[in-house]
Amino acid sequence: MIMTESREVIDLDPPAETSQEQEDLFIVKVEEEDCTWMQEYNPPTFETFYQRFRHFQYHEASGPREALSQLRVLCCEWLRPELHTKEQILELLVLEQFLTILPEEFQPWVREHHPESGEEAVAVIENIQRELEERRQQIVACPDVLPRKMATPGAVQESCSPHPLTVDTQPEQAPQKPRLLEENALPVLQVPSLPLKDSQELTASLLSTGSQKLVKIEEVADVAVSFILEEWGHLDQSQKSLYRDDRKENYGSITSMGYESRDNMELIVKQISDDSESHWVAPEHTERSVPQDPDFAEVSDLKGMVQRWQVNPTVGKSRQNPSQKRDLDAITDISPKQSTHGERGHRCSDCGKFFLQASNFIQHRRIHTGEKPFKCGECGKSYNQRVHLTQHQRVHTGEKPYKCQVCGKAFRVSSHLVQHHSVHSGERPYGCNECGKNFGRHSHLIEHLKRHFREKSQRCSDKRSKNTKLSVKKKISEYSEADMELSGKTQRNVSQVQDFGEGCEFQGKLDRKQGIPMKEILGQPSSKRMNYSEVPYVHKKSSTGERPHKCNECGKSFIQSAHLIQHQRIHTGEKPFRCEECGKSYNQRVHLTQHQRVHTGEKPYTCPLCGKAFRVRSHLVQHQSVHSGERPFKCNECGKGFGRRSHLAGHLRLHSREKSHQCRECGEIFFQYVSLIEHQVLHMGQKNEKNGICEEAYSWNLTVIEDKKIELQEQPYQCDICGKAFGYSSDLIQHYRTHTAEKPYQCDICRENVGQCSHTKQHQKIYSSTKSHQCHECGRGFTLKSHLNQHQRIHTGEKPFQCKECGMNFSWSCSLFKHLRSHERTDPINTLSVEGSLL
């Protein structure tokens, strides 16, 4: 835009003055035409309509009615009621008021981003505060704060103000004598710098107000650093001299590039060399125009690196992070000429990866160098990125900031919360291109793909033909077309495909310099794209079936070292994962997670057909076989199918042992006792028909058998000796001890053995003098509550045990059993009924 400036010129020649006025009028006319042309191609923005509405003045209209109508038009242009809903209009009004009440130092930064909602404005402010906090934590030392290599020609620091101030100096005026900064200066708020523009002018403005003893430096080629005079006093004379030499060298580099005039340069060098305590000065007016040099494009890339340097004003002695100095040294050695196709950025010399921002390039370089500058103060673990250290520190603090809105479960990392959401939604975005199976987690897909590779390796021949390589190259090109971002990477890696020896193996894991990522060959998830920087790589051993990690105890081998570590806990008995609620420990984290659902009551796996919920996914899979009728586990001996593996295991025991239950009538032998009972009922029914006995007892026995069958279906754990079934395996184990007479639990007082742990506690109460359970009727005390309940039947007259034959009632079960034996001697059918009832 052409700017006109008024000048006071004393001239006695009228024609010259007239021509000057005509020239000014011509310039203004051209400016108006340029504005009209720009408005056609650059329509007013939301901020423009807002400013028109807020800055409208009454005198701009001819009268009150026109002023009101004009305001209505401007308000409609701002709020756009024909496009926005009432909620959106209210949001705009709230946003306008929110921007008004913001502190003055935040308002220009937020308005520069043009937020369209209150949430966007809040996000901008939070980002500013977060960067401020990070920069305060990254303290740098005073003398070494600006390393020599940092003074690159393009590294120019932006101004602290969102709108840089430019002070034009008249060429005919002599340079003014610079003034020293006042000793009493307020610290200037360090806010994140706005992106540099091509036409932005560099300034070295010095701010000084207030009462605190602080001196502010605006570095031209480096960063803005604030020093307290007390901090400067901690430095010795050699350190002060070193800093002045660095300053001279930096300004010399800038002058050589044309960023500073020679007069101003000599003046600044003289000021830096001054031995007084006020070491830093700057001219009040300095003209700095940015030359159109190609190296100046490097400034925006160095912005992320420059922002990492900051001095903490609350600390007396400054510190320097050595890794930051090495990072800056590495940055200055990188030239923008290394980029391909004229792009600005940095390319890694080890793996060829390209980065636009210098900060991302620095983080990537630590992968090759193995540097881990961020160390945990609690356990000493080190990390190559600060975000990883922050996530690790939450393990010590117990902080879990990411909470699920559905079940309330909290997580330390946001990615874990995203994975957890798929449990509620049932979404499985990661699909296998080979078999079409979907998975909820990327790691599960990787493990599944390894199985395909092992299967293919067994089917492939030993030939190393070119057709195999060409087919893989073709598949890589197909996926490179699906994702243009990977095209360059795929072309680089196609030439690095290794020999496909036994099993079509491929170099899946990048050896820091070469290799093909697995996902470039097998594809990506079905419903969303994955970040290729986070894709793990399949090692060559997964396709060949090699298991290099071997257990020294039992000789078992594993593909991954993590699986070996988990396996070794079985031998060592180590259980590092402990439940905070009940104190139980587990050797794997997944087992602890499943156990914690017992306390929380969480059942994330729901059956879509009947709505029944389960704590473990495998239980849901077993339950779904009830609806489908599928019985995948079949017996090789008799061909019988089962819905659960445990049922098949119990069935196989029947084939492995002898038939021990024999019928006395016909001599037939049975595996299970309940089968013998069913068979004997048939014999009793035949006898009843011959003798003409009432069929009521016979039908009652059949009912008992049918009830027993239903019971067995719901209770999968069955005793091989007596046929009794249980719903839980632990109950079956305790029941086996009644047959084997095993008593593994011993009393510490009398050394008596008992079969169950609960019986041990009950037994030990005999030796305790306290009888906590007392009868209210007679005052008698008992050690066990069950004994008290039996005693109270004497007072109440309760007789809960009834004989089904004669209807006689008894107070105790032992009395009922004695009574039933009298019926056994008279009626053989009742013998079977008693046995059936006991079962």
UniProtKB/Swiss-Prot annotation:
Main subcellular location: nucleus
Span of domain SCAN box: 51-132
Lineage, broadest ranks: Eukaryota, Metazoa, Chordata, Craniata, Vertebrata
Keyword Transcription annotated: yes
GO BP annotation list: regulation of DNA-templated transcription; regulation of transcription by RNA polymerase II
Zinc finger (C2H2-type): 346-368, 374-396, 402-424, 430-452, 549-571, 577-599, 605-627, 633-655, 661-683, 717-739, 745-763, 773-795, 801-823
Residue intervals of the KRAB domain: 218-291
Originating species: Homo sapiens
Record location of the Glycyl lysine isopeptide (Lys-Gly) (interchain with G-Cter in SUMO2) cross-link: K216, K248, K270, K303, K317, K509, K513, K709, K785
Function: May be involved in transcriptional regulation.
The keyword Coiled coil belongs to this UniProt entry's keyword annotation: no
InterPro entries in alphabetical order: KRAB, KRAB_dom_sf, SCAN_dom, SCAN_sf, Znf_C2H2_sf, Znf_C2H2_type
One Pfam family recorded for the sequence: zf-C2H2
Protein name: Zinc finger protein with KRAB and SCAN domains 5
Keywords noted in UniProt: DNA-binding, Isopeptide bond, Metal-binding, Nucleus, Phosphoprotein, Repeat, Transcription, Transcription regulation, Ubl conjugation, Zinc, Zinc-finger
Highest taxon of source: Eukaryota
Residues with Phosphoserine modification: S335
